[in-house]
């Protein structure tokens, strides 16, 4: 798990080292915490029904999504409007290739690369390269 989580949550600032290319879409905005030296390319979507925390030196390719909200598998519950939310935490020095999707409840460790087109459904440890759908570790770095 990332050491950045608690540090980033305390800051909750956007400073001169934060650059988000337009368009950028989020649900609320106030549930998002950016570390220093954050960069996101075009078409970033963050569905921040609950907290989304990014560490320092995070780079995000184009067309990426971070989704904290989900819906039940059970049809009756889903049709009743039930929704759940689980936080997403991204460590320090993480690079996301383009078209990556990160699903609710995921933690991504420090010094990690997530390959283009990946769908991250489970936690990814520190110091690895992970790719695919579902995203899996392919190499330690």
Language model: regions and residue ranges:
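N-terminal active-site beta-alpha-beta segment that forms phosphate/nucleotide-binding
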Residues: 13, 17, 37
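Acidic, glycine-centered active-site loop in nucleotide-sugar glycosyltransferases
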Residues: 125-126, 131-134
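Single conserved hydrophobic/aromatic residue that forms the stacking wall/gate
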Residues: 1-5, 9
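Flexible, glycine/small-residue-enriched loop-and-beta-strand segment within the central core
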Residues: 24-34, 39-107, 133-135, 140-141
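A generic "structured core" feature
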Residues: 95, 113-115, 119, 127
């Amino acid at each position: 798990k990332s050491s950045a989580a608690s540090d980033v949550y305390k800051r909750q600032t956007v400073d001169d080292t934060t650059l988000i290319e337009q368009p950028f879409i989020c649900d609320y905005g106030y549930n998002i915490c950016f570390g220093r030296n954050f960069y996101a390319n075009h078409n970033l979507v963050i569905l921040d029904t609950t907290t989304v925390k990014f560490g320092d030196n995070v780079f995000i390719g184009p067309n990426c999504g971070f989704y904290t909200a989900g819906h039940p598998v059970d049809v009756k519950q889903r049709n009743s409007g039930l929704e759940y939310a689980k936080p997403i935490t991204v460590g320090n020095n993480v690079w996301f290739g383009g078209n990556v999707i990160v699903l609710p409840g995921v933690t991504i460790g420090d010094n990690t690369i997530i390959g283009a087109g990946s769908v991250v459904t489970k936690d990814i440890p520190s110091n690895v390269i992970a790719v695919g759908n579902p995203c899996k570790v392919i190499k330690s770095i």
